[in-house]
Structures are given as C-alpha cells and as structure tokens.
Amino acid sequence: MPPKRIAKRRSPPEDAIPKSKKVKVSHRSHKTEPGLVLTLGQGDVGQLGLGESVLERKKPALVPLLQDVVQAEAGGMHTVCLNQSGQVYSFGCNDEGALGRDTSVEGSEMVPGKVELQEKVVQVSAGDSHTAALTEDGRVFLWGSFRDNNGVIGLLEPMKKSMVPVQVQLDMPVVKVASGNDHLVMLTTDGDLYTLGCGEQGQLGRVPELFANRGGRQGLERLLVPKCVLLKSRGSRGRVRFQDAFCGAYLTFAISREGHVYGFGLSNYHQLGTPGTASCFIPQNLTSFKNSTKSWVGFSGGQHHTICMDSEGKAYSLGRAEYGRLGLGEGAEEKSIPTLISRLPVVSSVACGASVGYAVSKDGRVFAWGMGTNYQLGTGQDEDAWSPVEMTGKQLENRVVLTVSSGGQHTVLLVKDKEQS
C-alpha cells in the first residue's frame, strides 16, 4: 500500500494574518500608585482645574472631582490626568484642541472633563498645545496641534488640528510616549524611537537642518508622519536600540540599551550637555554623561535648562542659569555638563517647568527652585529661589508627594495621604 500523501498546509493569505498580536505593553515609566491632584501657579485659562473663579494659587490647591489619579501632567497651558481605570481627564486652554473634548459650554474647560476614548490608557504626555495617550495594547492617540515659530503646522496632517483623539498609524506597539513643547517621541517594544512634530531645533533627530523648517520640498509630511530615528551602531551591523526617552521643551534625550545617553535638539545654553551651543539635528552620543560609576535614569527639560537624575537618587542640572533655575545657589552661571545639586536629599524623580526645577525626595517631599514670578514654587512669594526650597502648604500636610509636573505658568502635584503609604 503506497504511503499516504500528507497534504501540505496552505499558508493563509497575507491579509488573513493579524498584523500585530494584542500585547499588553509595560515600561518602568508607567505609574500605578493612585493619588489626589494639587495645582498651583497661574490659571487664567483654567489650567489649575479649580473653576472660573480661581485664576491663581500661591500654594497647592486640591482639584475636586479627581480621584485615584495615577499620572498628572502639565502641558504649556493645560493639564491632563490619568486615573487607575485608564480614563483620561483634561482642563485648561482648548484653543488648539489640547483638551481633546468639547468645551462649548462656558467654563467647562476650567474644570476636569473626561476625554472620550474607548481604550484603557496606561500613560499620557502633554506639550504646549497637544496631548498624547498610550493604550494598554501599545497604540497611541493624539489630539491638539503642533506649532513652529510661524504658527500651527498641524497634527498628523499638514495644517489640520484635531479637537478629538485620533490614532497615530504605527505598525509596532509603543511602550512610552514623551512630549516636548511641540514634538512627540514614541518608544517601541523593539527599542526604536519614532518622532513627529516641529523639527526646527533638531528635536526630531531625523530631519536635517536643511529641511527642518516646514519639511523642505517634502513639505510638512516630513515632520508630521512619524518616522524612526536611525542611528548606526558602532562596531556592529545593526542600529542603536533604546530603553528610554525623555523630552525637554525643544530637545530629546534617549538612553540606549547599553546605557549610553544620546541627545538632539536645541542646546543654545548647553542644555543638551554639548560643548558647543549649536542645535543638534542628529543624535549625539553625549560624552558629558559618561561616567562609569552611575547610570542616568531620569531627564526633564525646561525652556533652556535640563534637570536629570542618576540611579543613586542624586539630581543634577545644566543649561541656562538665570532666575536660579539650575538650583545651584545664588550667582550660579550656565553649565555645559551635569552639575550636582548638592542641597537635596535622595530623590525619586525630577521635573522642569519653563524656568523652574523640581525634585521629589524618596520620603515624599517636593523641592522647588527657579523663577518665582508665576507662584510655581509654592513659597507664597514671587521671588526667585536660587537653591531648592521645600514646598509647604495646607494641602501637603500629612501627605506624601508622588510626582510633580510643570508647565509654562502652572505646576501639578500628585499626592496621597500618609496613612496609606
């Protein structure tokens, strides 16, 4: 009897294969500890979330209606909060669509309102007039608009802003989103960096200076269609893969899987840690961050300064020094390398506003320094602080601070009651 012929399995047609399996993405930057939201500073467009009658707070104030918040981010003139169940709330300026929701009812932008998203969100980021949300399966939704020096350039399509969330088209699941003033950085599961938005200062890391102004001949698509930042790996045939990425106002920092720090964007006050002050349009391996004894774990950039931290919980600053924004004491001058902020306890996170700096200590206190004009320091005064000052206030009593985020004129704290910790 002849042997039975085993029928060869026909491979399914290409389009029948699901493009990407449903994955649950995770990254160490995703926050899970729930808390309450406090805001302070200037709130003339509703970015404090305290209603139409409160346009300024010199001390942290509790934002009503928000509970179990795991992430609170300050954009330029708006605030975005993510709660434990993956829902997004926003408040503040909605002129360009940064809130992602209808605010036609007068005053509705001044209090927290829900952004309609069907998916569970695990991370949010906010820029000057845009907001991004990362879902648990690695998709990114975006709303608002990006601007350059001449005005609006669009969001995902030239000159078109979006008042509601739209999905960013990418083939690869994203694990982290980070926003500069007018650019977005997405880190994928594969360790690739995709960037979009304004590229004038080099912050996209993939658009040469020649085309940085509105994309050259290719037009705005060159800037607004997310593309990968390609960087050849020395000594091997592949490309550099990244484990983390952070944004300043006009710059981007990325940490490779080997632990090297790369940066691109504006460095007119050495805020990238470059020896010169030229903008960097392609990723630079930043030798000023090379030190065999420590690894860098956090970066935050203001308008012209950077605050960063190492794995030992020490905070450093570099860049422009005016108004005390480096936290290095009275009379400190501009720094081109990370310089230790010695008057701080062990820190768990750092943050920047436009001209201010913050550090949250391991024991849950928050320290602030820099320009006092907008009451963002929580001292109750409008004087500048050249060294870190511990923030105090009624709403901080018997509470620990989880995180801090700061925008152009306002600051947002995530706190929880001491009993729970």
UniProtKB/Swiss-Prot annotation:
Residues 1-10, 19-30 have a biased composition (Basic residues). The modification N,N-dimethylproline is found at residue 2. Guanine-nucleotide releasing factor that promotes the exchange of Ran-bound GDP by GTP, and thereby plays an important role in RAN-mediated functions in nuclear import and mitosis. Contributes to the generation of high levels of chromosome-associated, GTP-bound RAN, which is important for mitotic spindle assembly and normal progress through mitosis. Via its role in maintaining high levels of GTP-bound RAN in the nucleus, contributes to the release of cargo proteins from importins after nuclear import. Involved in the regulation of onset of chromosome condensation in the S phase. N-terminal methylation by METTL11A/NTM1 is required for binding double-stranded DNA and stable chromatin association. Dimethylation produces a permanent positive charge on the amino group, which facilitates electrostatic binding to the phosphate groups on DNA, while inhibiting histone-binding. Methylated tail helps retain RCC1 on chromosomes during nucleotide exchange on Ran. It is found in: Nucleus; Chromosome; Cytoplasm. This is Regulator of chromosome condensation. Residues 1-31 are annotated as: Disordered.
